[in-house]
């Protein structure tokens, strides 16, 4: 099996697990946060800079890379690792979420999804087989099965149909996925309905994927509902398979996910808000582009030792962002990724020492106060 997880420690008071995820491109510690490199790049960053922030496993996007530059071109370049000069592990999502986000631009049938490109309106058709062809050409260490992501809120009837189709599509993905140096993960759906989540999990667990994504959360539902789904789902998940909560990356959700037994996370949030001039700090979010920081010569976060906080002030970074200088959003991105990776490092240490609940309380008390 190209990808497997070895659980090294279970936290005494929670479901949290400390593990090592082995992939064809090296071993990474879990719980892990994956920076998102939608178009084969973590926006504004070089691979070396991503590594300096603590990033070890990155995510890239099947839908976007299929449209531009095309999966055949990436294959010709020697695969995604060579193309983007990243020597660590990569995960590609299946494009399911992106396609379903297109709303009126897409039509779902049993065979697959017809959609119009958000770039030029051209027509395309994704089937599970087509998505497997694309992901195998990209050659990431982990490929996600093609799923149907039900929106929130949605009728139970719709959630059932999406769940059933996700199961059938997972079977089709598994049938045609042949690449031996790539692991195919299944994705559990079911909306916010506990019985449907359980059903989806059981159907996918029966297919014995080497790992499982939990999809269809963080799509607008209240956080409490997401936590309820995890509380109910995690006890039935196999101990020896990685569990990946898709699209989740705010500091509070990362901690709450780990407490419930999640191993892997990804999210555009840290990099996206950085480009809007907002950063995470130990005292909550700070919008550094705001006028109140024009004469503030302190670092963005006084407790942070990232490159940006060691060298630049809020006033300077605000100036860069206000004048549309690219360095500004590079510095906020470096900081946010460093902040999240540092948080994950602290979480792993807290699991090691069986004090995750104390860490959660201490961190959130100060973070939420901001």
UniProtKB/Swiss-Prot annotation:
Claim: Zinc is one of the keywords in the record: yes
What is this protein identified as?
Queuine tRNA-ribosyltransferase
Q: What does this gene product do?
A: Catalyzes the base-exchange of a guanine (G) residue with the queuine precursor 7-aminomethyl-7-deazaguanine (PreQ1) at position 34 (anticodon wobble position) in tRNAs with GU(N) anticodons (tRNA-Asp, -Asn, -His and -Tyr). Catalysis occurs through a double-displacement mechanism. The nucleophile active site attacks the C1' of nucleotide 34 to detach the guanine base from the RNA, forming a covalent enzyme-RNA intermediate. The proton acceptor active site deprotonates the incoming PreQ1, allowing a nucleophilic attack on the C1' of the ribose to form the product.
Q: Where does substrate bind?
A: 93-97, 147, 189, 216
**Organism, as annotated:** Desulforamulus reducens (strain ATCC BAA-1160 / DSM 100696 / MI-1) (Desulfotomaculum reducens)
Q: What pathway is it annotated to?
A: tRNA modification; tRNA-queuosine biosynthesis
Q: Which domain of life is it from?
A: Bacteria
Quaternary structure and partners: Homodimer. Within each dimer, one monomer is responsible for RNA recognition and catalysis, while the other monomer binds to the replacement base PreQ1.
Record text on cofactor binding: Binds 1 zinc ion per subunit.
The family classification in the record reads:
Belongs to the queuine tRNA-ribosyltransferase family.
């Amino acid at each position: 099996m190209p990808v497997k997880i070895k659980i090294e420690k279970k936290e005494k008071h929670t479901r949290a697990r400390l593990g090592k995820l082995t992939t064809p491109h090296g071993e990474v510690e879990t719980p892990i946060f994956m920076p998102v490199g939608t178009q084969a790049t973590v926006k504004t960053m070089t691979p070396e800079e991503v590594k300096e922030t603590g990033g070890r496993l990155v995510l890239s996007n099947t839908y976007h890379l299929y449209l531009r530059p095309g999966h055949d071109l990436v294959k010709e370049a020697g695969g995604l690792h060579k193309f983007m000069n990243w020597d660590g592990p990569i995960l590609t999502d299946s494009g399911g979420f992106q396609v379903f986000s297109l709303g009126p631009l897409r039509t779902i049938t049993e065979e697959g999804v017809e959609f119009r490109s958000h770039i030029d309106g051209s027509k395309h058709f994704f089937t599970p087989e087509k998505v497997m062809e694309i992901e195998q050409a990209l050659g990431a260490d982990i490929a996600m099965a093609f799923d149907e992501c039900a929106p929130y809120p949605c009728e139970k009837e719709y959630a059932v149909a999406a769940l059933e189709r996700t199961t059938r599509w997972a079977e089709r993905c598994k049938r045609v996925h042949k690449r031996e140096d790539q692991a195919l993960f299944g994705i559990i759906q079911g909306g916010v309905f506990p019985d449907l989540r359980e059903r989806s999990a059981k159907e996918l667990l029966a297919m014995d994927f080497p790992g499982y994504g939990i999809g269809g959360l963080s799509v607008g539902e209240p956080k409490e509902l997401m936590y309820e789904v995890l509380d109910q789902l995690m006890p039935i998940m196999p101990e020896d398979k990685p569990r990946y909560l898709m699209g989740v990356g705010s500091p509070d959700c990362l901690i709450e996910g780990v407490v419930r037994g999640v191993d892997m996370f990804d999210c555009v949030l840290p990099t996206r808000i950085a480009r809007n001039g907002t950063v995470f700090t130990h005292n909550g979010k700070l919008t550094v582009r705001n006028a109140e920081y024009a004469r503030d010569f302190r670092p963005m976060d006084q407790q942070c030792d990232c490159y940006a906080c060691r060298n630049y002030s809020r006033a300077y970074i605000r100036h860069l962002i206000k004048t549309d200088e690219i360095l500004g959003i590079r510095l906020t991105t470096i900081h946010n990724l460093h902040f999240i990776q540092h948080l994950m490092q602290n979480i792993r240490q807290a699991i090691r020492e069986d004090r995750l609940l104390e860490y959660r309380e201490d961190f959130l008390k100060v973070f939420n106060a901001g």
